[in-house]
Amino acid sequence: MRLVVIGVNHKTAPVALRERLALVGDDVNIALAQLQGFSDGSVIVSTCNRTEIYALVPESILSPNTLLASSALSVVESSISLNSSTNISSTIISAHILKIKTWLADFKQLSLDEIDPYLYVHRDMHALTHWLRVAAGLDSMILGEPQILGQIKRAVHLAQDQKALSNQLGWIVDQVFAAAKRVRNETQVGAQAVSLSYAAAKLVTQIFDDLPSRTLLVVAAGEMNRLVAMHIAGLGVGRIIICNRNPERAEALAAELRNPKRQIEVRTLQELPQVLAEADIVSSCSGSMDILIDKTMTLRALKSRRYQPMLMIDLAVPRDIDSTVSRIDDVYLYSVDDLQHVIAGNIEQRRQAAVDAELLVSQLVVEMDRRFQVRQVGKDIQQYRSRTHEQVDKLLQESIAKLQGDNANPEDIMIELTRRLTQNLTHAPSKLMRKAAREGDNELLDFVVSGLQDAHRHH
Protein backbone atom coordinates (compact mmCIF):
# COMPACT_ATOMS: atom_id res chain seq x y z
CA MET A 1 0.00 0.00 0.00
CA ARG A 2 3.08 2.26 0.48
CA LEU A 3 1.34 4.15 3.33
CA VAL A 4 3.47 5.15 6.32
CA VAL A 5 2.69 7.20 9.41
CA ILE A 6 5.27 8.85 11.65
CA GLY A 7 4.16 10.74 14.74
CA VAL A 8 3.94 11.42 18.45
CA ASN A 9 0.90 11.56 20.71
CA HIS A 10 -0.11 11.98 24.34
CA LYS A 11 0.90 8.38 25.07
CA THR A 12 4.42 8.53 23.63
CA ALA A 13 5.67 12.08 24.23
CA PRO A 14 5.45 14.70 27.01
CA VAL A 15 3.53 17.88 26.33
CA ALA A 16 6.75 19.94 26.11
CA LEU A 17 7.96 17.87 23.14
CA ARG A 18 4.50 17.75 21.54
CA GLU A 19 4.46 21.55 21.63
CA ARG A 20 7.85 21.72 19.89
CA LEU A 21 6.78 19.23 17.20
CA ALA A 22 3.38 20.84 16.55
CA LEU A 23 2.78 21.83 12.91
CA VAL A 24 0.24 24.66 12.74
CA GLY A 25 -0.53 27.70 10.62
CA ASP A 26 1.96 28.43 7.85
CA ASP A 27 4.19 25.61 9.09
CA VAL A 28 1.72 23.08 7.69
CA ASN A 29 1.69 24.64 4.22
CA ILE A 30 5.48 24.78 4.09
CA ALA A 31 5.79 21.24 5.44
CA LEU A 32 3.34 19.82 2.89
CA ALA A 33 5.23 21.52 0.07
CA GLN A 34 8.55 20.11 1.27
CA LEU A 35 7.15 16.61 1.77
CA GLN A 36 5.93 16.65 -1.83
CA GLY A 37 9.60 16.57 -2.85
CA PHE A 38 9.99 13.01 -1.62
CA SER A 39 6.49 11.55 -1.10
CA ASP A 40 3.54 10.63 -3.34
CA GLY A 41 1.14 12.69 -1.24
CA SER A 42 0.92 13.56 2.45
CA VAL A 43 -1.51 14.65 5.17
CA ILE A 44 -0.42 16.32 8.43
CA VAL A 45 -2.65 15.92 11.49
CA SER A 46 -1.54 18.22 14.31
CA THR A 47 -3.62 18.74 17.47
CA CYS A 48 -2.82 19.43 21.12
CA ASN A 49 -2.48 15.68 21.67
CA ARG A 50 -0.74 14.50 18.50
CA THR A 51 1.36 15.40 15.48
CA GLU A 52 1.27 12.81 12.70
CA ILE A 53 2.53 12.69 9.13
CA TYR A 54 0.69 10.30 6.80
CA ALA A 55 2.64 9.84 3.58
CA LEU A 56 2.89 7.56 0.57
CA VAL A 57 6.32 6.17 -0.28
CA PRO A 58 6.97 7.14 -3.93
CA GLU A 59 6.04 4.35 -6.32
CA SER A 60 9.07 5.20 -8.45
CA ILE A 61 11.58 4.13 -5.79
CA LEU A 62 9.82 0.77 -5.38
CA SER A 63 9.94 -0.19 -9.07
CA PRO A 64 11.96 -3.38 -9.76
CA ASN A 65 14.77 -1.53 -11.56
CA THR A 66 15.07 1.13 -8.89
CA LEU A 67 15.04 -1.39 -6.05
CA LEU A 68 18.21 -3.10 -7.20
CA ALA A 69 19.98 0.15 -8.04
CA SER A 70 18.98 2.06 -4.91
CA SER A 71 21.77 3.55 -2.87
CA ALA A 72 19.76 2.78 0.25
CA LEU A 73 20.74 -0.88 -0.12
CA SER A 74 24.41 -0.11 0.36
CA VAL A 75 23.83 0.40 4.07
CA VAL A 76 22.43 -3.05 4.75
CA GLU A 77 22.92 -5.10 1.61
CA SER A 78 25.27 -7.46 3.41
CA SER A 79 22.53 -8.46 5.85
CA ILE A 80 19.77 -9.25 3.35
CA SER A 81 19.22 -11.51 0.41
CA LEU A 82 19.29 -9.51 -2.81
CA ASN A 83 17.07 -12.20 -4.33
CA SER A 84 14.26 -11.23 -1.98
CA SER A 85 12.21 -8.37 -3.42
CA THR A 86 10.22 -8.22 -0.17
CA ASN A 87 13.36 -7.59 1.88
CA ILE A 88 14.58 -5.01 -0.62
CA SER A 89 11.22 -3.18 -0.60
CA SER A 90 11.19 -3.21 3.20
CA THR A 91 14.68 -1.73 3.26
CA ILE A 92 13.71 1.01 0.82
CA ILE A 93 10.62 1.89 2.89
CA SER A 94 12.71 1.95 6.09
CA ALA A 95 15.15 4.32 4.41
CA HIS A 96 12.24 6.55 3.35
CA ILE A 97 10.83 6.57 6.89
CA LEU A 98 14.25 7.63 8.18
CA LYS A 99 14.24 10.41 5.58
CA ILE A 100 10.89 11.73 6.87
CA LYS A 101 12.09 11.52 10.50
CA THR A 102 15.26 13.43 9.63
CA TRP A 103 13.25 16.01 7.70
CA LEU A 104 10.89 16.51 10.68
CA ALA A 105 13.79 17.01 13.09
CA ASP A 106 15.45 19.52 10.75
CA PHE A 107 12.17 21.32 10.06
CA LYS A 108 11.53 21.82 13.79
CA GLN A 109 15.21 22.60 14.46
CA LEU A 110 15.66 19.57 16.70
CA SER A 111 18.09 16.67 16.57
CA LEU A 112 16.89 13.25 15.42
CA ASP A 113 18.32 11.69 18.60
CA GLU A 114 16.16 14.10 20.58
CA ILE A 115 12.84 13.08 19.01
CA ASP A 116 13.38 9.53 17.74
CA PRO A 117 12.70 7.75 21.08
CA TYR A 118 9.23 9.33 21.16
CA LEU A 119 8.24 8.71 17.53
CA TYR A 120 6.06 5.80 16.48
CA VAL A 121 6.03 4.39 12.97
CA HIS A 122 3.41 2.28 11.18
CA ARG A 123 3.45 1.08 7.59
CA ASP A 124 1.05 -0.42 5.07
CA MET A 125 -1.96 -2.11 6.72
CA HIS A 126 -0.70 -1.24 10.21
CA ALA A 127 -0.66 2.42 9.15
CA LEU A 128 -4.19 2.09 7.78
CA THR A 129 -5.37 0.45 11.02
CA HIS A 130 -3.79 3.25 13.06
CA TRP A 131 -5.41 5.96 10.93
CA LEU A 132 -8.83 4.34 11.29
CA ARG A 133 -8.40 3.97 15.08
CA VAL A 134 -7.45 7.65 15.32
CA ALA A 135 -10.40 8.76 13.16
CA ALA A 136 -12.81 6.64 15.21
CA GLY A 137 -11.59 8.17 18.48
CA LEU A 138 -10.10 4.89 19.74
CA ASP A 139 -6.63 6.41 20.10
CA SER A 140 -7.78 9.64 21.78
CA MET A 141 -7.07 10.79 25.32
CA ILE A 142 -10.86 10.86 25.80
CA LEU A 143 -11.98 7.54 24.34
CA GLY A 144 -14.46 7.97 21.50
CA GLU A 145 -14.28 11.78 21.34
CA PRO A 146 -15.70 13.04 18.02
CA GLN A 147 -13.54 16.15 17.54
CA ILE A 148 -10.58 14.24 16.07
CA LEU A 149 -12.56 13.22 12.97
CA GLY A 150 -13.27 16.88 12.20
CA GLN A 151 -9.60 17.71 12.77
CA ILE A 152 -8.54 15.00 10.31
CA LYS A 153 -11.05 16.29 7.74
CA ARG A 154 -9.61 19.80 8.07
CA ALA A 155 -6.10 18.36 7.64
CA VAL A 156 -7.21 16.55 4.47
CA HIS A 157 -8.83 19.70 3.05
CA LEU A 158 -5.60 21.60 3.70
CA ALA A 159 -3.62 18.87 1.91
CA GLN A 160 -6.04 19.17 -1.03
CA ASP A 161 -5.59 22.94 -1.12
CA GLN A 162 -1.81 22.50 -1.20
CA LYS A 163 -2.04 19.86 -3.98
CA ALA A 164 -0.52 17.33 -1.57
CA LEU A 165 -3.32 14.76 -1.80
CA SER A 166 -2.56 12.26 -4.55
CA ASN A 167 -5.24 10.05 -6.11
CA GLN A 168 -4.19 6.98 -4.12
CA LEU A 169 -3.91 8.87 -0.83
CA GLY A 170 -7.29 10.45 -1.53
CA TRP A 171 -8.75 6.97 -2.06
CA ILE A 172 -7.28 5.81 1.26
CA VAL A 173 -8.71 8.88 3.04
CA ASP A 174 -12.19 8.15 1.64
CA GLN A 175 -11.93 4.57 2.92
CA VAL A 176 -10.85 5.77 6.38
CA PHE A 177 -13.71 8.29 6.66
CA ALA A 178 -16.33 5.75 5.55
CA ALA A 179 -14.98 3.14 7.97
CA ALA A 180 -14.78 5.61 10.89
CA LYS A 181 -18.42 6.55 10.27
CA ARG A 182 -19.38 2.88 10.45
CA VAL A 183 -17.50 2.43 13.74
CA ARG A 184 -19.38 5.36 15.27
CA ASN A 185 -22.76 4.32 13.87
CA GLU A 186 -22.49 0.60 14.62
CA THR A 187 -20.95 0.79 18.12
CA GLN A 188 -21.59 2.88 21.23
CA VAL A 189 -17.99 4.08 21.56
CA GLY A 190 -18.97 7.75 21.27
CA ALA A 191 -22.53 7.60 22.53
CA GLN A 192 -22.11 8.71 26.15
CA ALA A 193 -20.87 12.04 27.52
CA VAL A 194 -17.42 11.82 29.13
CA SER A 195 -16.56 15.51 29.70
CA LEU A 196 -18.21 17.88 32.16
CA SER A 197 -19.20 20.36 29.47
CA TYR A 198 -20.61 17.68 27.17
CA ALA A 199 -22.43 15.98 30.06
CA ALA A 200 -23.97 19.33 30.99
CA ALA A 201 -25.19 19.81 27.43
CA LYS A 202 -26.66 16.29 27.44
CA LEU A 203 -28.69 17.18 30.54
CA VAL A 204 -30.19 20.13 28.70
CA THR A 205 -31.48 17.91 25.88
CA GLN A 206 -32.98 15.49 28.40
CA ILE A 207 -35.05 18.22 30.07
CA PHE A 208 -35.84 20.65 27.23
CA ASP A 209 -36.78 19.79 23.64
CA ASP A 210 -37.64 23.30 22.41
CA LEU A 211 -34.24 24.98 22.79
CA PRO A 212 -34.79 27.83 20.28
CA SER A 213 -37.36 29.24 22.73
CA ARG A 214 -35.13 28.78 25.80
CA THR A 215 -32.69 31.10 27.59
CA LEU A 216 -29.28 30.07 28.91
CA LEU A 217 -27.74 32.08 31.76
CA VAL A 218 -23.95 31.78 31.96
CA VAL A 219 -22.65 32.87 35.37
CA ALA A 220 -18.90 33.61 34.99
CA ALA A 221 -17.07 33.45 31.67
CA GLY A 222 -14.19 31.12 32.54
CA GLU A 223 -12.97 28.28 30.34
CA MET A 224 -15.28 25.59 31.77
CA ASN A 225 -18.38 27.73 31.35
CA ARG A 226 -17.18 28.75 27.90
CA LEU A 227 -17.15 25.07 26.87
CA VAL A 228 -20.61 24.51 28.36
CA ALA A 229 -21.96 27.58 26.57
CA MET A 230 -20.42 26.48 23.27
CA HIS A 231 -21.98 23.01 23.56
CA ILE A 232 -25.43 24.32 24.49
CA ALA A 233 -25.27 27.04 21.84
CA GLY A 234 -24.52 24.32 19.31
CA LEU A 235 -27.77 22.63 20.32
CA GLY A 236 -29.70 25.69 19.15
CA VAL A 237 -30.61 27.61 22.32
CA GLY A 238 -32.29 30.87 21.29
CA ARG A 239 -30.97 33.33 23.89
CA ILE A 240 -27.84 33.54 26.05
CA ILE A 241 -27.21 35.92 28.95
CA ILE A 242 -23.64 36.23 30.25
CA CYS A 243 -23.05 37.56 33.78
CA ASN A 244 -19.43 38.20 34.69
CA ARG A 245 -17.38 40.45 36.97
CA ASN A 246 -15.01 41.28 34.12
CA PRO A 247 -17.02 42.85 31.24
CA GLU A 248 -14.16 42.38 28.74
CA ARG A 249 -14.13 38.61 29.22
CA ALA A 250 -17.92 38.50 28.98
CA GLU A 251 -17.83 40.45 25.71
CA ALA A 252 -15.15 38.10 24.35
CA LEU A 253 -17.35 35.07 25.08
CA ALA A 254 -20.37 36.86 23.60
CA ALA A 255 -18.40 37.43 20.39
CA GLU A 256 -17.67 33.69 20.16
CA LEU A 257 -21.32 32.78 20.68
CA ARG A 258 -22.86 35.47 18.50
CA ASN A 259 -25.13 34.17 15.74
CA PRO A 260 -27.87 35.81 13.62
CA LYS A 261 -30.38 33.29 15.00
CA ARG A 262 -29.34 33.80 18.63
CA GLN A 263 -29.81 36.71 21.02
CA ILE A 264 -26.74 37.46 23.18
CA GLU A 265 -26.75 39.78 26.20
CA VAL A 266 -23.98 40.77 28.62
CA ARG A 267 -24.91 41.75 32.18
CA THR A 268 -22.96 42.48 35.35
CA LEU A 269 -22.82 40.01 38.20
CA GLN A 270 -24.78 42.51 40.32
CA GLU A 271 -27.74 42.03 37.96
CA LEU A 272 -27.84 38.28 38.63
CA PRO A 273 -30.92 38.36 40.95
CA GLN A 274 -32.93 40.15 38.25
CA VAL A 275 -31.87 38.07 35.23
CA LEU A 276 -32.20 34.73 37.05
CA ALA A 277 -35.96 34.79 36.46
CA GLU A 278 -35.38 34.98 32.70
CA ALA A 279 -33.27 31.80 32.60
CA ASP A 280 -34.51 28.32 31.79
CA ILE A 281 -30.96 26.95 32.04
CA VAL A 282 -28.26 28.20 34.41
CA SER A 283 -24.60 27.21 34.20
CA SER A 284 -22.37 28.62 36.94
CA CYS A 285 -18.63 28.24 37.49
CA SER A 286 -17.22 31.39 39.10
CA GLY A 287 -14.45 30.36 41.49
CA SER A 288 -16.03 32.58 44.14
CA MET A 289 -15.74 31.58 47.81
CA ASP A 290 -19.33 32.75 48.41
CA ILE A 291 -22.71 31.41 47.32
CA LEU A 292 -23.97 33.39 44.32
CA ILE A 293 -27.45 31.87 44.01
CA ASP A 294 -29.27 30.95 47.22
CA LYS A 295 -32.65 29.40 47.92
CA THR A 296 -34.41 32.73 48.49
CA MET A 297 -33.14 34.19 45.20
CA THR A 298 -34.22 31.04 43.36
CA LEU A 299 -37.72 31.00 44.90
CA ARG A 300 -38.18 34.63 43.93
CA ALA A 301 -37.06 33.93 40.36
CA LEU A 302 -39.27 30.84 40.11
CA LYS A 303 -42.32 32.78 41.27
CA SER A 304 -41.59 35.53 38.74
CA ARG A 305 -41.46 32.98 35.92
CA ARG A 306 -44.72 31.32 37.04
CA TYR A 307 -42.92 28.18 38.22
CA GLN A 308 -41.71 27.10 34.82
CA PRO A 309 -38.97 24.45 35.29
CA MET A 310 -35.34 25.52 35.65
CA LEU A 311 -32.20 23.47 35.08
CA MET A 312 -29.24 24.61 37.20
CA ILE A 313 -25.74 23.26 36.62
CA ASP A 314 -23.16 24.15 39.27
CA LEU A 315 -19.64 23.34 38.07
CA ALA A 316 -17.91 25.46 40.72
CA VAL A 317 -15.84 24.24 43.65
CA PRO A 318 -16.70 25.69 46.16
CA ARG A 319 -20.31 25.75 45.02
CA ASP A 320 -21.92 28.80 43.45
CA ILE A 321 -25.48 27.54 44.06
CA ASP A 322 -26.77 26.66 47.52
CA SER A 323 -27.36 22.90 47.72
CA THR A 324 -30.77 23.50 49.39
CA VAL A 325 -32.00 24.80 46.03
CA SER A 326 -32.31 21.14 44.99
CA ARG A 327 -35.26 20.79 47.38
CA ILE A 328 -37.35 23.28 45.41
CA ASP A 329 -39.99 21.78 43.13
CA ASP A 330 -39.49 22.52 39.43
CA VAL A 331 -35.74 23.14 39.90
CA TYR A 332 -33.26 20.52 38.69
CA LEU A 333 -29.86 21.16 40.31
CA TYR A 334 -26.77 19.21 39.30
CA SER A 335 -23.39 19.68 40.98
CA VAL A 336 -19.95 18.82 39.61
CA ASP A 337 -20.05 15.61 41.69
CA ASP A 338 -23.37 14.61 40.09
CA LEU A 339 -21.88 15.06 36.63
CA GLN A 340 -18.68 13.23 37.56
CA HIS A 341 -20.76 10.27 38.71
CA VAL A 342 -22.59 10.22 35.37
CA ILE A 343 -19.30 10.53 33.48
CA ALA A 344 -17.67 7.66 35.39
CA GLY A 345 -20.47 5.33 34.34
CA ASN A 346 -20.30 6.61 30.76
CA ILE A 347 -16.53 6.07 30.57
CA GLU A 348 -17.00 2.44 31.58
CA GLN A 349 -19.71 2.05 28.92
CA ARG A 350 -17.34 3.51 26.32
CA ARG A 351 -14.59 1.11 27.39
CA GLN A 352 -16.95 -1.81 26.89
CA ALA A 353 -18.09 -0.41 23.54
CA ALA A 354 -14.45 0.02 22.51
CA VAL A 355 -14.03 -3.77 22.52
CA ASP A 356 -16.73 -4.04 19.84
CA ALA A 357 -15.24 -1.06 18.01
CA GLU A 358 -11.77 -2.64 17.88
CA LEU A 359 -13.24 -5.86 16.44
CA LEU A 360 -15.09 -3.85 13.80
CA VAL A 361 -11.91 -1.93 12.96
CA SER A 362 -10.10 -5.23 12.33
CA GLN A 363 -12.88 -6.39 10.01
CA LEU A 364 -13.01 -3.07 8.17
CA VAL A 365 -9.25 -3.04 7.61
CA VAL A 366 -9.47 -6.50 6.01
CA GLU A 367 -12.28 -5.23 3.75
CA MET A 368 -10.26 -2.13 2.83
CA ASP A 369 -7.23 -4.28 2.05
CA ARG A 370 -9.30 -6.43 -0.30
CA ARG A 371 -10.69 -3.37 -2.06
CA PHE A 372 -7.19 -1.98 -2.37
CA GLN A 373 -5.88 -5.25 -3.83
CA VAL A 374 -8.72 -5.29 -6.40
CA ARG A 375 -7.96 -1.67 -7.25
CA GLN A 376 -4.25 -2.37 -7.48
CA VAL A 377 -4.71 -5.50 -9.62
CA GLY A 378 -6.77 -3.46 -12.07
CA LYS A 379 -3.92 -0.97 -12.28
CA ASP A 380 -1.35 -3.78 -12.66
CA ILE A 381 -3.39 -5.42 -15.43
CA GLN A 382 -3.61 -2.11 -17.26
CA GLN A 383 0.17 -1.63 -16.98
CA TYR A 384 0.83 -5.23 -18.08
CA ARG A 385 -1.38 -4.83 -21.14
CA SER A 386 0.27 -1.53 -21.98
CA ARG A 387 3.75 -3.05 -21.77
CA THR A 388 2.63 -6.04 -23.86
CA HIS A 389 1.24 -3.73 -26.55
CA GLU A 390 4.51 -1.79 -26.54
CA GLN A 391 6.53 -4.98 -26.99
CA VAL A 392 4.28 -6.23 -29.79
CA ASP A 393 4.40 -2.84 -31.55
CA LYS A 394 8.19 -2.80 -31.28
CA LEU A 395 8.54 -6.29 -32.79
CA LEU A 396 5.99 -5.47 -35.47
CA GLN A 397 7.82 -2.27 -36.48
CA GLU A 398 11.11 -4.19 -36.67
CA SER A 399 9.48 -6.79 -38.91
CA ILE A 400 7.93 -4.12 -41.16
CA ALA A 401 11.34 -2.50 -41.51
CA LYS A 402 12.89 -5.83 -42.52
CA LEU A 403 10.14 -6.43 -45.09
CA GLN A 404 11.12 -3.19 -46.81
CA GLY A 405 14.74 -4.28 -47.19
CA ASP A 406 16.34 -5.75 -50.29
CA ASN A 407 16.07 -9.51 -50.69
CA ALA A 408 13.53 -9.67 -47.84
CA ASN A 409 11.88 -13.04 -47.37
CA PRO A 410 8.39 -12.38 -45.97
CA GLU A 411 7.95 -15.97 -44.84
CA ASP A 412 11.17 -15.98 -42.78
CA ILE A 413 10.34 -12.60 -41.28
CA MET A 414 6.85 -13.72 -40.25
CA ILE A 415 8.22 -16.94 -38.74
CA GLU A 416 10.78 -14.94 -36.74
CA LEU A 417 8.09 -12.48 -35.61
CA THR A 418 5.86 -15.32 -34.46
CA ARG A 419 8.74 -16.98 -32.60
CA ARG A 420 9.75 -13.78 -30.81
CA LEU A 421 6.15 -12.98 -29.89
CA THR A 422 5.74 -16.48 -28.47
CA GLN A 423 8.94 -16.12 -26.46
CA ASN A 424 7.89 -12.76 -25.05
CA LEU A 425 4.38 -13.87 -24.13
CA THR A 426 5.45 -17.16 -22.53
CA HIS A 427 8.57 -15.94 -20.74
CA ALA A 428 6.87 -14.57 -17.59
CA PRO A 429 4.50 -17.53 -16.95
CA SER A 430 7.30 -20.00 -17.71
CA LYS A 431 9.58 -18.27 -15.22
CA LEU A 432 6.80 -18.26 -12.62
CA MET A 433 6.08 -21.97 -13.15
CA ARG A 434 9.77 -22.88 -12.74
CA LYS A 435 9.98 -20.79 -9.56
CA ALA A 436 6.84 -22.42 -8.12
CA ALA A 437 8.18 -25.90 -8.92
CA ARG A 438 11.59 -25.09 -7.46
CA GLU A 439 10.05 -23.81 -4.21
CA GLY A 440 7.47 -26.60 -3.97
CA ASP A 441 4.56 -24.17 -4.26
CA ASN A 442 2.09 -26.59 -5.83
CA GLU A 443 -0.86 -24.28 -5.27
CA LEU A 444 0.75 -21.51 -7.34
CA LEU A 445 1.93 -24.01 -9.96
CA ASP A 446 -1.57 -25.48 -10.37
CA PHE A 447 -3.06 -21.98 -10.55
CA VAL A 448 -0.70 -20.87 -13.34
CA VAL A 449 -1.09 -24.11 -15.32
CA SER A 450 -4.89 -24.09 -15.09
CA GLY A 451 -4.94 -20.40 -16.04
CA LEU A 452 -2.85 -21.03 -19.16
CA GLN A 453 -5.03 -24.00 -20.11
CA ASP A 454 -8.16 -21.84 -19.76
CA ALA A 455 -6.54 -19.21 -21.97
CA HIS A 456 -5.81 -21.81 -24.67
CA ARG A 457 -9.36 -23.16 -24.54
CA HIS A 458 -10.81 -19.66 -25.03
CA HIS A 459 -8.57 -18.96 -28.00
Swiss-Prot record:
| Residues annotated as binding substrate | 47-50, 140, 145-147, 151
Q: Does the keyword Mitochondrion apply?
A: no
- Keyword tags: NADP, Oxidoreductase, Porphyrin biosynthesis
Entry superkingdom:
Bacteria
One Gene Ontology MF term: glutamyl-tRNA reductase activity
Q: Name one GO biological process term.
A: protoporphyrinogen IX biosynthetic process from glutamate
Known SUPFAM superfamilies for this protein? Glutamyl tRNA-reductase catalytic, N-terminal domain, Glutamyl tRNA-reductase dimerization domain, NAD(P)-binding Rossmann-fold domains
Enzyme Commission (EC) number: 1.2.1.70
- Sites annotated Important for activity: 130
Alphabetized InterPro entries for the sequence: 4pyrrol_synth_GluRdtase, 4pyrrol_synth_GluRdtase_dimer, 4pyrrol_synth_GluRdtase_N, GluRdtase_dimer_dom_sf, GluRdtase_N_sf, NAD(P)-bd_dom_sf, Shikm_DH/Glu-tRNA_Rdtase
Q: Spell out the CDD domains in the cross-references.
A: NAD_bind_Glutamyl_tRNA_reduct
The pathway that the record names for this protein is:
Porphyrin-containing compound metabolism; protoporphyrin-IX biosynthesis; 5-aminolevulinate from L-glutamyl-tRNA(Glu): step 1/2
Tell me the Pfam families matching this sequence.
GlutR_dimer, GlutR_N, Shikimate_DH
- HAMAP family per UniProt: Glu_tRNA_reductase
Q: How does it assemble?
A: Homodimer.
Function of the protein: Catalyzes the NADPH-dependent reduction of glutamyl-tRNA(Glu) to glutamate 1-semialdehyde (GSA).
Record's miscellaneous remark: During catalysis, the active site Cys acts as a nucleophile attacking the alpha-carbonyl group of tRNA-bound glutamate with the formation of a thioester intermediate between enzyme and glutamate, and the concomitant release of tRNA(Glu). The thioester intermediate is finally reduced by direct hydride transfer from NADPH, to form the product GSA.
Domains: entry comment:
Possesses an unusual extended V-shaped dimeric structure with each monomer consisting of three distinct domains arranged along a curved 'spinal' alpha-helix. The N-terminal catalytic domain specifically recognizes the glutamate moiety of the substrate. The second domain is the NADPH-binding domain, and the third C-terminal domain is responsible for dimerization.
> What name does this protein carry?
Glutamyl-tRNA reductase
Q: Which organism is it from?
A: Psychrobacter arcticus (strain DSM 17307 / VKM B-2377 / 273-4)
